[in-house]
Amino acid sequence: MEYLSSNKIAIIDLGASKTIQKELDEDLVKEKIGGAGITTALYEEYRDEDPIVLGTGLLTGTLAPASALGMVTAKSPVTGKICHAPFTLYGGVELKYCGFDYVVIKGSSPKPVYLWIHDGIADVNDGKEIWGKDVWISTDMIREVMGDPLIQILAIGKAGESESDFAQVCINYWASGDRWGFGKLFGQKKLKLVAMRGMSLLEIADPEGFVRKCKEFLSTIKSGPYAGKGGIGELSAAMGEDIRQWLEPIIHRHLSCFNTPFPTNTFVFLDEDPKLLKETEKKEPGFLITDVHGLLGYKKLGLSAAEACDLLRDCAKYGIDAVAVAELSQKAGKKKPDEIKKSLSGLKGSLESVGKGKFSPWAPSFTLSSDEWERRQAVAYLFGIHPIYALMSPEFSEEKLIELANLGTGLGFTSETLDKVIIDILK
């Protein structure tokens, strides 16, 4: 696969501590497009070896607006089905730039390990020094050892190590869109984390046409209803659950994921003045809210914004799904922060918030029907578009994404191709 691709798939056998590489077949891209289409195909190819598949969308890491998506595809311990969880911020683009479009992780290691994927190389390294550490400490340790603070990391905490059904794979220090318990799968495989760093380049079939169309696309988006807005508060308002006034006193700033026009993340200060302009001297001044549902769950328990965000921080360090914690705490009648924190290590119960679909409910439905939401998510996961922003922006038409894909690859994708792939991954 020559264009919009690193042209490599890493097959990592944790049991043997070995990695092999194979080319990304252009025929597979023509048939499955990318993203969840190919991660699903790779999962099926290695199904007998209980794989976890990391992947990127066809447009991930390009000038296409909101092309920030990376994904994890595996069998969910929560639903028992093959599901897809998103990771955004700069994780998706880093995976593609480090030299691999897809990574298949199969088998289990007899001892703790982590993966170091960089510059077209995938190493299986001893993880005994970071096993037992929380997500934040693990992330810091790897970045310090490698001497690079820009390394992107998918990590589990103690919830994953203890194989909790609600263990989450986190992105750097923060919650991801993993609502499927994929952190438990990492723990079962003795895989502590995946560290990614690279500076590859992507070739484009029609560079001038692709860049021109991306600029036109972005210009259209800038005149949309969310232009000039941003943050978790705006997301909640669009969902019909406005928390802006409740959250405002602790907001420090809003942050966008790679090349995403709308900042879907909000950083709050918990141990520092939120209006501080100079660099804080505190080591852990606050928390980046990346999941609106977790925040809303704690608000429904009657907590203050500061209490809710402090709990989100504890959940991220422990590597557990905050939405599950909030829902099960409500069922158990636990509404005090201290008693909720104490329950993290023994959390059990069934969830109603997960749903039965293939794509993470991390992305709000807004005003879409379930069928509309599912199709929009499928399109986002194929092309590598931020799943939340894809729902917020009607400008992301399937026709425009197909046009960008064809300018980028020259492969001649059609709406019929897209329909077929969507049907396949929704089976």
Model-predicted segments: where are they?
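Extended C-terminal regions of large enzymes
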Residues: 13, 19, 28-31, 68, ...
